[in-house]
Structures are given as C-alpha cells and as structure tokens.
Amino acid sequence: MTEATTIPSVTLSNGVVMPAIGFGVFQIPDDAMDATVRHALAAGYRAFDTAPMYGNERSLGRPLTDSGVPRQELFVTTKVSNEDQGYQSTRDAVEKSVARLGLDYVDLCLIHWPAPARGTYLDTWRALEALHARGLGPAVGGSNFQPD
C-alpha cells in the first residue's frame, strides 16, 4: 500500500471546505469498487465523485461506510441527471442518491448538465437550495455549464 498523502483543500464560497483533488468513480464496475475505494482511501483520497447515471452510487457507499474513516473526513459528491431536473423530481432524485449511497447526506450535489433547452435548471437549483436548507447537502453547484 502507498503511504497516505495529505491532499490540499479549498474553501467554497459558503465556507464548506473540500479536498482540492477527488476520486471520480465513472465507469468503475460494481465488482471492482470495494478494492478501488480501499486503495484510494489508503492513498489519501477523501473526496469521491459519483452520479446516478454512473450506476454505482450503491457500490461506492458500501466501502466508504465500511472503511472506518469517520464520515466527517469524507467528501462525497453526486449529481442530478437531466431527466431528474425540475423542482420535485430533483428533490426525489437527491433523496434516492443519498439512500443508494447509504449516507445521511452528500457533501456536494451538482446539476450534472444545465440542459437550458429543457427550461428546468432554475427549478432544479431551487430544489438543491431547499435540500441544502434541510441538511441533505452542505454545498450545491453546477457542472458542465458553458460560458454562454
């Protein structure tokens, strides 16, 4: 095993501190997740990035909760898929993601793609703010937004 490395952190605009480098689990199959996460934790990773469309939230949550690393030392990000955008569907989708992960909350929940043609990303954002206020996510944001 590699000796764990201390990863620098960044402070978000709302004061939430997150590791500057995270471990993405896109395309990691369920049968490889336990060993992969164990090695990532041993190497010092504490931030993990997933999404419902990756199909592996449940298999990521298991090794994280079984790792013995205190929850407050982990930083878990998930995302809202395009088909889940809209106020109520976003709320439902995030609650399902948290349940699949086997956690009480996610540290960061992102709008995976803005999909402006759908006209729902503002309602999606409002839902993320409401979930944040309920404690299901200390931080919210967007990914893959374009400059225009």
Region locations from a protein language model:
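Active-site mouth loops of central-metabolism enzymes
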Residues: 19-31, 78-88, 113-119
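Residue-level detector of alpha-helix boundaries and kinks
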Residues: 8, 45-46, 79-82, 113, ...
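Charge-rich, low-complexity amphipathic helices
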Residues: 45, 62-63, 70, 82, ...
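Short beta->alpha linker loops
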Residues: 52-55, 82, 144-145
